[in-house]
C-alpha cells in the first residue's frame, strides 16, 4: 500500500488521474470522429505542454533553492559583519553548528533571531556613538569657533554607517569627550575670569562694560540662553587683548590722576586751603599713596573724575597766580627766618626787594621764583643738618661765655658774700661758672678743628652770619690773649702801686682820701681810673666807651661789629679769669689819693 504524501503515491495518483482523463478524451474523440493522425498530433501536443509545465516548476524550485542559499549566505555574512563591528566574540552561528541535518529554511529560521538581536545592539551602539560624536563635535566647534559649519557637517557624518562599533572604540570616544569637556570647563572658567577682570577694570575706568565685552564677542554679555558663551581661541585672545588695553589705559589714567592730585596737594599746601574744601576730593587723595594694582574703587579713574580734579587744579592755579606775589614773600620770609635760626646768609638774588621788582616787571615767572626759593629752603635745611654738630658746640661755647659774663658781674658785687636771700645759690653757680670758664680754651680749639674738618669735607668756608667762623674764633683767641696780657700788666702795676703806697704810708702815715666816696661802683658799670691814664681800664659789661681789644667778641657780636647786621644786635662781651674788682677798686682809690699829693692837679699823672 502506498503511503499518502510519498512521491510514489503522488505519482500513482497522478497517473490514475491522467489515464482517466485520457480515456475520457479518447471517448470524446471517437464520438467526434477524429482521425488517428489527428489523435496522435493532439496527444503529442498534450505531452509537450505537460513537459513545459513540469520544466517550469522545476526551474521555479531551483530558483527558490538558490535564493534560499543566497539568503542563508547573506545572513551568515551579516552575522559575521555585525559580530565584527560590535566586537562580539562569544556568540556562535547556528548554521555552523549543524550544517547537514537542517534544510535551508530551517537554517534561515534558526539564524534570524540572532541577526535581529545583533541589529538591535548595532542600533543602540550607533546611537551611543552618535550622541558622543555629537557632543564631541559640538564642543570642538565651540572651542574652534566654527560651530555652525561643524553642526552641518555633523548631520552628514552621522548618516554614514559606522564601521567600528566596538566597546574599545566607544571608550576611546568617551575618553576624548571627557578631555574636551574638561578643556571646555577650563576655557569657560578662563573666559569668566577674563570677563570678571574686564568688569573690574571697566568699573575703575568708568567704561561701559557691555559695549566693551560685546566688542570681543556678543555672547559674552547676553542675558538669554539662545547662544552659549563663546570659548574659542579668538575670544580668549580678544579678551586678553582687551584686558591689556584696559590695563594700559588704567596705567595712563592712574599716572595722570596721580600727577594732578600731587599738583592739587601742592596747591593746597601753598595756599593753606581749609580742610573742609579738601574733603570733597577725599576719595582721590589716597591715589598718591596707593599703587596702581590697589586702585579698585568704581569710577576712581574715570574721565569725569580726572576732569573734575583737573578743573579744581586749574581753578587753584589761577588763584595761585593772583596770590603768587604773596606766596613768594611768605616763603622768602620763611627762608630768612630759617637763615636767622641757622646763622646762614640767605641768597640775595631772591631778596624781598628784588623778588617784588622781578614780579612787578614780569621778567620772571612767579612760579619759577617760588621754586627757586623752595630750592634754597631745602638747601639751607640740608646745610643746617651738616652744621648741626658745630652749631651745638657754638651754643655751648656761647653759654660758657654767658657764664663768664655773669661771673664778672658777680665779682663786682660788694655784697656777694652777704648772708642775704639767694647768696648760697649764687656761690654755687659761681663755682660751676669757674669750672665752665676753664673749659673755654679747649672748647674754642675743638670748635676750630671741627670747623676745619667741615670746610675740608664741604669744600667751602663755614660762615656764621656771613663771617668765617674760624676767623671769629682766631680773633677771639687773640683778643682773649691780649686781655690776659693786659690783666697781667695790671696786676704787676698794682703790685708796684701797693709797694709805693706802703712806702708812702710809712713816711707820711695813712690819710683818708677825699675822693673815696666817688670811687664806689656805679650801677651802670665799673670803671677803674688812676687819674693819669697809666692804669688800663678793666673789662666791663656796661655800654662804656672802650677800645676793641678790651672786648671779647663772640660770633654774634663779631657779626654786629664788622657787618652791622640787623639780625644780631646783642653784643656779648667776655672776659678771662675774673678778678676781685671790688678789692681792686678800693686799692685803686687809695692809690689815687696818695698820688694826688705829689701832683699839681688832683688827677695829674704819677711822678715816677
Curated annotation (Swiss-Prot):
Phosphoserine: residues carrying this PTM: 513, 604
Composition skew (Polar residues), residue ranges: 526-535
Residue ranges crossing the lipid bilayer per the database entry: none
A Pfam family of this chain: MAP65_ASE1
UniProt keyword list: Cell cycle, Cell division, Coiled coil, Cytoplasm, Cytoskeleton, Microtubule, Mitochondrion, Mitosis, Nucleus, Phosphoprotein
Record-marked site positions (Microtubule binding): 419, 430
Subcellular location(s) of the protein: Nucleus; Cytoplasm; Mitochondrion; Cytoplasm, Cytoskeleton, Phragmoplast
Recorded GO MF terms: microtubule binding
Stretches with biased composition (Low complexity): 510-523
GO biological process, one term: cell division
Listed InterPro entries: MAP65_Ase1_PRC1
Chain segments annotated as coiled-coil in the UniProt record: 164-186, 368-388, 467-503
Keyword Glycoprotein belongs to the record: no
Stretch list, region Disordered: 501-565
One CC-aspect GO term: microtubule
Family: Belongs to the MAP65/ASE1 family.
PANTHER family recorded: 65-KDA MICROTUBULE-ASSOCIATED PROTEIN 6, PROTEIN REGULATOR OF CYTOKINESIS 1 PRC1-RELATED
SUBUNIT field: Forms a dimer. Binds to polymerized centrally located endocytic MT.
Role according to the record: Microtubule-associated protein that mediates the formation of a mesh-like stable and dense network formed by individual microtubules (MT). Confers MT resistance to high concentration of NaCl.
Protein name, UniProt field: 65-kDa microtubule-associated protein 6
Species the sequence originates in: Arabidopsis thaliana
